[in-house]
Amino acid sequence: MRILLSNDDGVHSPGLVALYEGLKGLGELKVVAPDRDHSGASNALTLNRPLTVEQHPNGFRSVDGTPTDCVHLAVNGLFDTAFDRVVSGINTHANLGDDIIYSGTVAAATEGRHLGLPAIAVSLVNNGHFHYDTAARVVRLLLEYKQALKLGPRSILNVNVPDLPWERLSGFRVTRLGHRERAEGAVPMTCPRGKQRYWIGAAGQGGDAGPGTDFHAVREGYVSITPVHIDMTRHEALSGLREWVDGMDESTGGQP
């Protein structure tokens, strides 16, 4: 099994190193990750300049681009043989609910899916202890058993692991994405030259965080596993919207 590892925290992230160490012996591992932190980059793809790839003494490769760039280059240009899996992480913080829209960690997995590969995005629900070894062990277990899991080649699993020793985990839960409340306001500041600057405000708390959600699972000490797909169509709105458009056509005689 050939596994591509990437992330959004950068090629020197301790989470990425822990993931690599934890998956040794499971297959052929290749690491292609951003040369710096790209948290919150989402699915950004660099189209306005060429990208540079550098190989480090430990064999890891870095790209001066986004997580999506890294997976795209790795699958479509850097290596002669194909990959079987993409694993993105271990992210330093949780990717729960609406976080996945912004997450570069999930975006790297998403790019794998776009290129026809099953993918896992794994994040540590960090409380300051940094039990990356626990998260790496979770990923190894999932990869070992994923052969029997019939999700298809374009599947994505979003995995969030409580920041606990392995023996203190409550178990595993299959969950749906919860939802956060509105984000906190932007934080203004004045730079030394007197110009106004702003920091993006903190993410909102889990508003939809009850039983069955990823928020609830990790709060109870469970590993949260959420199957994610890319279709953003709001299917339940299609019928009503068609009726509205049909009525609009009738009132305008079919003219815009």
From Swiss-Prot:
Alphabetized GO MF terms: 3'-nucleotidase activity; 5'-nucleotidase activity; exopolyphosphatase activity; metal ion binding; nucleotide binding
Q: Which domain of life is it from?
A: Bacteria
Q: Which GO terms describe its cellular component?
A: cytoplasm
* Keyword Nucleotide-binding listed: yes
- Keyword Membrane found: no
Q: Which residues hold a divalent metal cation? A: D8, D9, S39, N91
Per the UniProt record, which EC number(s) apply here? 3.1.3.5
Chief location = cytoplasm
Q: Where in the cell is it found?
A: Cytoplasm
Its function? Answer: Nucleotidase that shows phosphatase activity on nucleoside 5'-monophosphates.
Name of the molecule in the record: 5'-nucleotidase SurE
**What organism does this protein naturally occur in?**
Marinobacter nauticus (strain ATCC 700491 / DSM 11845 / VT8)
**What lineage does the source organism belong to?**
Bacteria, Pseudomonadati, Pseudomonadota, Gammaproteobacteria, Pseudomonadales
